[in-house]
């Protein structure tokens, strides 16, 4: 605040105070300010001129100063607003549902309770080993992004997507198929019920085949019944996991689907059959099942897992793809949760997804050993002796023979060496799906040591976010499926139904990169101590040159599943490039 003394011969000395905004004071140098306030050497007549309230020049000058002050303040406010708006635009965006997001990428409502959750999430991210500037949802990538591709020159080859050779989805059914559809869709005499069992991806395979069988029989399909999983106690119904309306509407021109039997047939006991052989053909189904429908026209099938032949006529192969990739979508709430986690993983650039098969029962079933220590080998061997029925085929082979034959899952150490050899950057963000590994955190130590940014769904979910799905193993698996499918690079340590399903889905959506470990040929190099690291990496890259998700013809080998290899039945070549 500045102070002026005004002398008047008729009045006592008075002190006048003028408030000056801090912005103006700060913008004036101290020397100038000192002169402006305390310069007593100014001429008295000048001082009298300024403080004569009756002088019109004073009013004009005052208005001029006020105008300058107003412009300065307005300009300052505009600049302040622009700066804060730009900052907020970086810290806050909207998710797919229109909800605001914090700078961590988590959807939230502006309430004190939720702000506490966000704060807790920040603390959790630090506990997980995430650096302060690497909270989930940040908009600045930790990777250099030339041309918007999410990688620098050094890591370009690893993140580079395979050449899809112009293949795109095309489900053009034949004239004969469409003609038959008109007859089938008016059918009301035969109803097919199916009970599907196993884990999520086993259920999906059976649902796909159930639709195809209903089409072959010309029957109405009742929405499949999901058998309660005795191991996990999952009581989810079809509509809990999958989008029922999507399922019905997409297949409306292929198979008539109803949620329940008609009232006239509800009380009837369906004819039940579980004798379908492996590799059953459409001819076998047409000759065997029509006579199995009961008097009311209801047939119940069980144990469909991998029974229907993988080699079907082209139209039925297209129908398989239509069910697997277009009709069988996850329910809205499952999709929302999975998509949200995928967005958090991608918030700082591209990410890798791994499906790790390191659970105790996997080592027992495969006849392999984890490679952790003799302690864990003994645990697996004891369990295998107790339950010999769990061991899969080729039980005469030793665990070492199985490993060298490429029949064993990769352990964390092998996964780490493979990723490093293929050029995965150390700062790559990795999402891993799968059950609790035998050995817990110790089993994952080789991975976390080399790739510190390793997360699963529990690491990146907000507190209580996964609680509604806590006892729903199939829904948890569906969330993993979504995050893995949306990744930039995917790899399964041991094939399996989920790995195969994701491989086919990623191919159908544009041949996104998948690493298929060439276990049988690469493991000898893993134990060859005479190789330098450079030589090792060169050999591993050479082995996997054609195993990175490029289009591959299903018909090149008999018995391949079209939902894993959708070319050529379900995808057309738009560029006339041959495989």
Curated annotation (Swiss-Prot):
GO MF terms, alphabetically ordered: glycosyltransferase activity
Residues binding substrate, per UniProt: 355-357
Glycan attachment positions: 133, 528, 573, 576
Entry annotated with the keyword Transmembrane: yes
EC number of the protein: 2.4.1.-
Major enzyme class: transferase
InterPro entries: FucosylTrfase_pln, GDP-Fuc_O-FucTrfase
Membrane topology: Single-pass type II membrane protein
CDD domains: O-FucT_plant (cd11299)
GO CC annotation: membrane
Subcellular location: Membrane
Keyword terms, alphabetized: Carbohydrate metabolism, Fucose metabolism, Glycoprotein, Glycosyltransferase, Membrane, Signal-anchor, Transferase, Transmembrane, Transmembrane helix
Superkingdom field: Eukaryota
One Pfam family, short name: O-FucT
Gene Ontology process terms (BP): fucose metabolic process
Pathway participation: Glycan metabolism
Membrane-spanning segments: 58-78
Assigned protein family: Belongs to the glycosyltransferase GT106 family.
PANTHER family to which the protein is assigned, alphabetical: O-FUCOSYLTRANSFERASE 24 (PTHR31741:SF57), OS02G0726500 PROTEIN-RELATED (PTHR31741)
Name by which UniProt lists this protein: O-fucosyltransferase 24
Species this protein is from: Arabidopsis thaliana
Gene: OFUT24
């Amino acid at each position: 605040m500045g102070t002026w003394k005004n002398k008047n011969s008729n009045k006592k000395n008075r002190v006048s105070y003028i408030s000056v905004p801090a912005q103006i004071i700060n913008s004036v140098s101290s020397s100038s300010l000192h002169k402006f306030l305390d310069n007593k050497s100014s001429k008295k007549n000048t001082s009298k001129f300024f403080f004569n309230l009756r002088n019109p020049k004073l009013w004009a000058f005052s208005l001029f100063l006020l105008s300058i002050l107003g412009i300065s303040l307005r300009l300052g406010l505009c600049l302040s607003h622009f700066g804060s708006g730009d900052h907020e635009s970086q810290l806050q965006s909207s998710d797919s549902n229109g909800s605001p997001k914090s700078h961590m990428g988590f959807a939230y409502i502006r309430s004190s309770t939720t702000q506490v959750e966000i704060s807790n999430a920040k603390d959790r991210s630090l506990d997980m080993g995430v650096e302060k500037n690497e909270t989930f949802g940040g908009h600045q990538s930790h990777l250099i992004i030339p041309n918007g591709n999410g990688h620098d020159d050094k890591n370009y080859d690893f993140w580079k997507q395979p050449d899809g050779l112009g293949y795109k989805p095309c489900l053009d059914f034949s004239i004969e198929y469409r003609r038959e559809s008109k007859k089938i869709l008016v059918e009301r005499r035969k109803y097919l019920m199916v009970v599907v069992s196993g884990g999520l991806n086993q259920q999906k395979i059976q649902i796909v085949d159930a639709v195809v069988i209903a089409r072959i029989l010309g029957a109405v399909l009742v929405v499949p019944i999901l058998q309660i999983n005795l191991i996990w106690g999952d009581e989810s119904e079809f509509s809990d996991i999958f989008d029922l309306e999507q399922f019905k509407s997409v297949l409306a021109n292929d198979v008539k689907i109803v949620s329940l039997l008609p009232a006239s047939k509800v009380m009837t006991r369906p004819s039940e059959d579980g004798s379908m052989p492996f590799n059953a053909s459409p001819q076998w189904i047409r000759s065997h099942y029509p006579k199995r429908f009961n008097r009311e026209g209801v047939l119940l099938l069980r144990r469909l897992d991998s029974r229907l032949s993988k080699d079907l006529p082209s139209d039925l192969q297209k129908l398989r793809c239509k069910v697997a990739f277009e009709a069988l979508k996850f329910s809205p709430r499952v999709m929302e949760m999975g998509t949200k986690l995928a967005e958090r993983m991608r918030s700082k650039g591209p990410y890798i997804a791994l499906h790790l098969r390191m659970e105790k029962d996997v080592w027992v079933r495969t006849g392999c050993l984890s490679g952790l220590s003799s302690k864990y080998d003994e645990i697996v061997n004891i369990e295998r002796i107790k339950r010999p029925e769990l061991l899969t085929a080729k039980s005469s082979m030793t665990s070492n023979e199985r490993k060298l034959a490429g029949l064993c899952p990769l352990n964390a150490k092998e996964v780490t060496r493979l990723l490093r050899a293929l050029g995965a950057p150390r700062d790559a963000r990795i999402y891993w799906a799968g059950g609790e590994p035998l050995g817990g955190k110790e089993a994952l130590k080789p991975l976390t040591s080399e790739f510190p940014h390793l997360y699963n769904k529990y690491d990146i979910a907000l507190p209580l976010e996964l609680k509604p799905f806590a006892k729903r193993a199939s829904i948890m698996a569906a969330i993993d499926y979504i995050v893995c499918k949306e990744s930039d690079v995917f790899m399964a340590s041991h094939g399996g139904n989920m790995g195969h399903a994701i491989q086919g889905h990623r191919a159908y959506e544009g041949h996104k990169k998948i690493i298929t470990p060439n276990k049988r040929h690469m493991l000898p190099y893993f134990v060859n101590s005479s190789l330098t690291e450079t030589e090792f990496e060169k050999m591993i890259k050479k082995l996997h040159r054609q195993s990175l998700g490029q289009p591959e013809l299903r018909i090149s080998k008999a018995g391949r599943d079209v939902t894993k290899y959708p070319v050529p039945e379900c995808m057309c070549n738009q560029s006339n490039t041959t495989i």
